[in-house]
Amino acid sequence: MAVAGVAKRYAQAAFAVAKEHGQLDFWEQRLTDLEALARDSAVEEFIQNPAIPLEAKVQVIDRLFPGDENRYVRNLLVLLLERGRWHQLRDVVVAFRELLREHRGVIDVELVTAVPLEPSEVERLRRELAQRLSRPVELRTTVDPELLGGVVLKIGDEVFDASVRTQLTNLRRQLVGAAA
């Protein structure tokens, strides 16, 4: 999932700070917390409430992320607050994760199947893809019954469609073309 614009710039700045201070692993752990914070409707309501002063909001962030190790995470959140961009926190998290995967050489792969796969099958496919691509693979699976069978594999911008639906569509085109 590509994130553009302002959220990506915030993520790039946060990533640069985390990398400079050797905190990439720490930030990776904090991303889950930030994601939960961004999804929490009570937090959103509190942050968006104009009757609550900025200082009170900053104090809450200080309590949620205490200690010196959280300083840069806290700075990012306060900056988003001050600039009226809190609503972009989720996109910042997504963009940061993309940068982290890219930095670590991880390839994002989506596997779409007609039926759910067993976890052991998914893990076997992930290992095989990692071996063939000579890079670590983050494999996400989704189910689309309309495929009828087979798989669709999305690696970066490339799509490998070996679904029964596509094969039937191609066969139909060939038959119609031959009949014309």
UniProtKB/Swiss-Prot annotation:
Annotated TM spans: none
Domain of life, per lineage: Bacteria
GO cellular component, one term: proton-transporting ATP synthase complex
GO terms, molecular function: proton-transporting ATP synthase activity, rotational mechanism
Cellular localisation: Cell membrane
Main localization of the protein described in the UniProt heading: membrane
Membrane topology reported for the UniProt record: Peripheral membrane protein
InterPro entries associated with the record: ATP_synth_OSCP/delta_N_sf, ATPase_OSCP/d_CS, ATPase_OSCP/dsu
Pfam family, one: OSCP
UniProt keyword list: ATP synthesis, Cell membrane, CF(1), Hydrogen ion transport, Ion transport, Membrane, Transport
Record's keyword annotation contains Membrane: yes
Function noted in UniProt: F(1)F(0) ATP synthase produces ATP from ADP in the presence of a proton or sodium gradient. F-type ATPases consist of two structural domains, F(1) containing the extramembraneous catalytic core and F(0) containing the membrane proton channel, linked together by a central stalk and a peripheral stalk. During catalysis, ATP synthesis in the catalytic domain of F(1) is coupled via a rotary mechanism of the central stalk subunits to proton translocation.
Assembly and binders: F-type ATPases have 2 components, F(1) - the catalytic core - and F(0) - the membrane proton channel. F(1) has five subunits: alpha(3), beta(3), gamma(1), delta(1), epsilon(1). F(0) has three main subunits: a(1), b(2) and c(10-14). The alpha and beta chains form an alternating ring which encloses part of the gamma chain. F(1) is attached to F(0) by a central stalk formed by the gamma and epsilon chains, while a peripheral stalk is formed by the delta and b chains.
PANTHER family per UniProt: ATP SYNTHASE DELTA CHAIN
Similarity-based family: Belongs to the ATPase delta chain family.
Name recorded for this polypeptide: ATP synthase subunit delta
Species for this entry: Thermomicrobium roseum (strain ATCC 27502 / DSM 5159 / P-2)
